[in-house]
Amino acid sequence: CFPASKFLDALNANDQLFNIYPLLVYPCKIFNRGGLLKVGGKDTHQLGDGSVIQMNMNLGIYGIPPELENDVYPLFPMVGRVRQLEQWLRNNAGFQHTYCDSFQTRNEFHHMFDHSLYNKMRTKYECKGKFPTVYDKTRPEVDVFKWLKEEEKKNHGIEDTILLG
């Protein structure tokens, strides 16, 4: 999910990373209520009742990349590509829904979301040690950096860093 003004850039990122079509595209109205989502920038609007919203877009990328179907890679570098998309989202004031596959480190996840209120509430209700954090609930189940090395090894060192604008 990303600011609506970044829609064409997001389509280009999908082209470069996955080239999967059709895409599920839908607008999201994000309210600035002090939660985990960061709101701000030129896509922010004030409504008549005084509430602040940000118009975002979301892309659902579902399917098999053509490179995988055409055997371009022995092992499609999915972890590396998702990490590049996550970096693009962080760089463009976007976020990844927590129901998606995520391969972010704890620090990367914290950079993507505003944890101010969340941490305040966890402290107030003494959650530390009793309940897992959002990251702990949604973190990668694989060792991301070990998997990235495996992707590179299986692909015979094929460089797969796509520079997204």
What kind of region is each of these model predictions?
Residues 52, 69, 77-165:
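Activity-critical C-terminal alpha-helical subdomain
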